[in-house]
Amino acid sequence: LGYIWGFNPLSTDMVFKVTGRECAGAAIACTLGRAPTVANMRLVNDRMNVFAGQFNYPVGDLMNIPINTTMRGEVAFLPNKPYNISMFPGAYGLRASANPKYPDGVVEKNTLRYALGFDRTTLIPFLHPDDPWRAFSLSFQLFQNIIFDHEDGIHPFSSASKINRVSSLLTFRIGTGYLGDTILPDVFLGYDPEGYWSANPAISYVPPGNEKIKISLVGAFYGGHNKFKALGLFAE
């Protein structure tokens, strides 16, 4: 368990804040209220309170079934976390525009984040004919972000894609080694239930007797309809 008071290291948690407003027109037009108002904004990273904890627990049997899996987890509670908020749909045919309820474009909400992971090694002999005792490493993770007292229109500073009350991300990874662990194949899969997926197959070469050198070839494949969510941003 722990407590952090400081700046959030995640750039995606930054928000745009209004620092001032001014009239964008001639003095007479501003006086008559016939000139548009321009809002000056700044991207800020405020100090935050974070209550966090983690655990790591090996599980040998589940209901008398040997699973030999390590279960691990992390949890963080962020009170009064700032979010940008807009009105959807926006005025004048825009996808989003300023929310009259929040003229500064920022709202604070208590937020819970957690991750739950399962790791294990398993033998797949037919994929290792040269060394049937060389194991495969398997890892599955679930990430969730929950916004309490959620309001419609909350979105990240970087896009006009709304953040739901509960956001989820699933990942799976499998890897092993061949020829004395000089050839290391690896596959990473990610799935966002809101509309995106990614697949990253990779193969690495580690010269014998020199573990400090590693040469990797990584593929990147993306799909789905929502390119503004977490996985979709990498496709752009």
Label for each model-derived stretch:
Residues L1, T12, T69-G73, L116, ...:
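Transmembrane beta-strands of outer-membrane beta-barrel proteins
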